[in-house]
Amino acid sequence: MSIYKNLTMSFIALSFLFSVNQGEVSAQETPSLQIEEIIVTAQKREQSAQDVPIAITAMSEELLSSTIRDISDITGYAPNVVIGSEGRRPGGTDIQIRGISAAATTDNSYDSPIAINVDGIYLGTSAGSLLDNFDMERIEILRGPQGTLFGKNTVGGVVNVIRTRPTGEFGAKVQATFGEDGRQEFRAVVNTSLSETVAAKFFATSVQSDGWIPNITIGGNNGEEDYQAFGATFLFTPNKRFEALLTIETMDDQSALQAYNQNFNVAPGVIPPPPPGPNQTDFSGGLLSCAIYPDSCRTSPNQLPYAENDTQHDASVETDAITLNMKYDINDSLTLTYIMGHRDVKEDRIYDYDGSSAPFITIERWNEYDQTSHEIRLDGSYDNVKFTAGLYMFEKEFEQDWATGGTFWGVLFGAALSAPGQWEACQAFDGRYSVQCDVTIPAYPENGTLYQILYATQKTESIAAYAQADWSVTDRLILTTGVRWTEEEKHFIGGQAYLAAHDIGGGRNFADYADLQNKWDNTSVKVGLTYDLNNDSIVYASYTEGFHSGGYYAVVQNTSNMRQNAYDPEFSESIEIGYKALLMNKRVQLNMNYFLNDFMNKQEESTQQDPTTKTVASFWSNVANAEYEGFELDAQILVNQYFRMFFNYGTLDATYEGFVTDIDESDGVIKLENADFLTPRFAPEESYGIGGTLSIPAGQGTVDVFAKFSRIGEFETNLLNSDLGRAPETDNVNASIGYYQDNWSIVAYGQNLTDEQYEVVDPIMPLFAIGTINQGRRFGVVLSAEF
């Protein structure tokens, strides 16, 4: 461990001990000063977060920090958790929990292994899931498999978001934010009472900015924001036993995409080729687009503070959603709950896939998605048994068109297809070509502009039944058992034509369609023991199983790839041992846990050369088993009435078992070798966050000074651990200072104050590489008022 790390850890330890000692003194002076208790629904019923025997970080008061703009700003508050925005998708998220992350975040044909739930509704698409912080009551981050109660696609964990309920009293909260790059944000929530039995809440948000990375090719900026949302929530309480909570909302996000910004290819001689060895593709000699368009090559290997796209990254995601939650208390011991959710999402986007100033590859995507879910649940509480049992139904469907244009196809096939008789042969699809040419085009176009057209639609239906019970064996020992049965069916239809006219949805007369269907079922169990050491501390141990859906991947190069890319479910088995305690008169909250997660049939995606078409394609398979082992610490400290702090730390050791693949995709030879020496993606060995708030009385109000430092260790983003695709170790510092008085406040905030920027490079092996940089230092001011 480096000297810097030793000093850092020593400082943290000393700070902790000092805080505890100070707490002993201050506790006598202010015995009522305690850490806020947060009530969560991590086990489908209300409990104190400290009583839940799982690794959970619950946030409520922290959400008031002006440095938390959306859920991506939560990174650093929970160990082994990284939440980022998906720059290639409007409002998309990229979440890592304990090294588990979605192998693909840009397409609806793949389900994330981490669930985002909003008011009890599972979001089945990443588009629009980058949730705004305003009007949230709390966020619960559940780490590790949650298959028994939350079901499929939770092998990594769950981000559980709960918004505020109508108060039934007239009042309002308004907020305005102004920042760099023309940032203007306006938010409002109004509560009122419509009658003695109906309370209502109305909410609206508007976010706009001019973007933050200049595009030197076509002008303007990438990352421009234009987001509006509004809706209403109604609470109906006709009597003491029944309530119905209905939310109707719409969101319109016209923000531009942030990725990709640059082509990583550099002119020959600018950087040396990589050393000999597998999986180190040479991007230094002008591969493909750099060789064809030398003016678009980077002249420096250094990170560039601008974008070079020849296409404006326009995007749109429009969402309409309805959520209904009804609850009926049958008696003092039994409660029946019904939750229904429906979402319609329309998503469009266009982006420069080669990331350069050349008109080489431009991708356009149109997607319509809808989902409906129903859940009915019975919760019971008797003398020594508490249980939850329910039925769940989920259905989603998407339809997608995709067009890849630019000069790429002309460069690849133009010389052959422009020869006499060859266009007609390609149209006939008689075996001389691996692709078919558009029969509606009479001849090879003079400008050489061709399009690859893809179509895919998929319907998913799943049903589940579950039950979990806590049995108090003694006054201190609790036995937890749970089981969930799931059945899921997917029906996928896809077609693809390489060389076509740019006419999306115009008949879709493909030479071949893939019509694929499969059904899977799974039974997952949970067994756990919890022992109360005293009223304020517990130890627990649990064994939990999880299930991640199988399926078909739509982003491929031809219909044969669609058939080839059928992948099976992956399964997880997790052991967790933990300790939770409130110490020093509830001034210190200390949670620690060890975990061991075994994954079977782990799903992975790689970008390889298609041997039939000589272009790149996405290949999916269940590559191997994988093991994730680590330790987590999560602490909060109330030093005194003026200062509170938090600290979290996570370690992770991730390894493959039985991974066999072609470890050198660039040599043109398929050679399968043992690859257990590679590191699974998105698994930093170490991460931590530390921060605090100092409250200083000032006049009639209070000045709050907040700061947070977080560090994420380096991790692999490429399946074959390419040096080019390795994300570096990153530090992040956020801070704010604000004045709060009665019902108003003014806060100045700064994010990424050290201005640490890095480039994440995506190798499209063996053709080229594209890069995206993160946003640098930025400042803003937030004005808030309540009445």
Describe each model-derived feature in a short phrase.
Residues 411, 598, 645, 710-720, ...:
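C-terminal beta-signal and adjacent terminal beta-strands/loops
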Residues 235-239, 378, 390-394, 456-597, ...:
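Structural signature of Gram-negative outer-membrane beta-barrels, strongest in the C-terminal barrel
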Residues 325-329, 335-351, 532, 538-544, ...:
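Membrane-embedded beta-barrel scaffold of Gram-negative outer-membrane proteins
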Residues 33-169, 577:
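Acidic, small-polar-rich N-terminal luminal/periplasmic segments of exported/outer-membrane proteins
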Residues 386, 475-479, 591, 596-598, ...:
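Gram-negative outer-membrane beta-barrel transporters
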Residues 219, 225-388, 395-397, 589-591:
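Outer-membrane beta-barrel domain signature, strongest for Gram-negative TonB-dependent receptors
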